[in-house]
Amino acid sequence: MLRTTVSKLARPTVSRAFATTSRALAGETGAPPKTGGPGDAFQRREKANEDFAIRQREKEKLLELKKKLAEQQKHLKTLSDHIDEITREQGGERN
């Protein structure tokens, strides 16, 4: 018994270093895994809301473009009709 006590005292004491795991530091409940998992319900809902807002803006832009396209086509039609009217007044095309 005395020998084991002396041998334990003769060994230098090794103190453990303070360490934390990344899992413990990633956050409390609800933090997504670092592997790119789906996340918690709040994050999924937030992403869905952002995606919806983006789709709405894109839809509005698309409707604006369609409206401008219709206006341009109407303008081209009036110009084409005007050209046809002028050529009829001058006696048509003579080739």
Swiss-Prot record:
Subcellular localization, as worded in the UniProt entry: Mitochondrion
Q: Which GO terms describe its molecular function?
A: ATPase inhibitor activity
Q: Name one Pfam family in it.
A: IATP
Gene3D superfamilies the record matches: Single helix bin
- Indicate the principal place this protein occupies in or around the cell: mitochondrion
Alphabetically list the UniProt keywords: Mitochondrion, Transit peptide
- What does the protein in this record do? Endogenous F(1)F(0)-ATPase inhibitor limiting ATP depletion when the mitochondrial membrane potential falls below a threshold and the F(1)F(0)-ATP synthase starts hydrolyzing ATP to pump protons out of the mitochondrial matrix. Required to avoid the consumption of cellular ATP when the F(1)F(0)-ATP synthase enzyme acts as an ATP hydrolase. Functions through inserting its N-terminal part into the catalytically active F1-ATPase, thereby blocking its rotational movement and subsequently the ATP hydrolase activity.
Q: How does it assemble?
A: Associates with the mitochondrial small ribosomal subunit (mt-SSU). IF(1) coiled-coil forms a helical bundle with the C-terminal extension of uS17m and also binds to mS27 in the mtSSU tail. Since the C-terminal extension of uS17m stabilizing the IF(1) on the mt-SSU is specific to N.crassa, IF(1) binding might also be specific.
Region ranges (Disordered): 20-48, 76-95
Q: Transit peptide: present as a keyword of the record? A: yes
Q: Any idea what this protein is called?
A: F(1)-ATPase inhibitor IF(1), mitochondrial
Family listed? Belongs to the ATPase inhibitor family.
Record organism:
Neurospora crassa (strain ATCC 24698 / 74-OR23-1A / CBS 708.71 / DSM 1257 / FGSC 987)
Transit peptide stretch: 1-25
What UniProt notes about the protein's domains is: The inhibitory N-terminal region (residues 23-59) is entrapped between the C-terminal domains of the alpha(ADP-bound)-beta(ADP-bound) (atp1-atp2) subunits in one of the 3 catalytic interfaces of F(1)F(0)-ATPase.
Under the heading InterPro entries, the entry gives: ATPase_inhibitor_mt
Bilayer-spanning residue ranges? none
Cellular component annotations (GO), alphabetically ordered: mitochondrion
Source taxon at top rank: Eukaryota
